[in-house]
Curated annotation (Swiss-Prot):
Keyword Metal-binding among record annotations: yes
Membrane spanning residue stretches: 18-34
Family: Belongs to the PsbE/PsbF family.
Subcellular localization(s) per the UniProt record: Plastid, Chloroplast thylakoid membrane
Record lineage: Eukaryota, Viridiplantae, Chlorophyta, core chlorophytes, Chlorophyceae
Protein's recorded name: Cytochrome b559 subunit beta
Entry annotated with the keyword Membrane: yes
GO terms for biological process, alphabetical: photosynthetic electron transport chain
Oligomeric and partner information: Heterodimer of an alpha subunit and a beta subunit. PSII is composed of 1 copy each of membrane proteins PsbA, PsbB, PsbC, PsbD, PsbE, PsbF, PsbH, PsbI, PsbJ, PsbK, PsbL, PsbM, PsbT, PsbX, PsbY, PsbZ, Psb30/Ycf12, at least 3 peripheral proteins of the oxygen-evolving complex and a large number of cofactors. It forms dimeric complexes.
Residues that coordinate or bind heme: H22
Organism domain of life: Eukaryota
The entry's keywords: Chloroplast, Electron transport, Heme, Iron, Membrane, Metal-binding, Photosynthesis, Photosystem II, Plastid, Thylakoid, Transmembrane, Transmembrane helix, Transport
Length: 43
């Protein structure tokens, strides 16, 4: 955090980490909501 020279040159935000977080986070929340809704609809 003190010296961010190498990190500023490359963009660590738009990398595999960003893709994995969004590719695994959004669908997980969506599926969790769908499963919860189905549980309430069944009974």
């Amino acid at each position: 955090m003190t010296t961010a020279n190498s990190e500023e040159k490359t963009y660590p935000i738009f990398t595999v980490r960003w893709l994995s977080v969004h590719a695994l986070g959004i669908p997980t929340i969506f599926f969790l909501g769908a499963i919860t809704a189905m549980q309430f609809i069944q009974r």
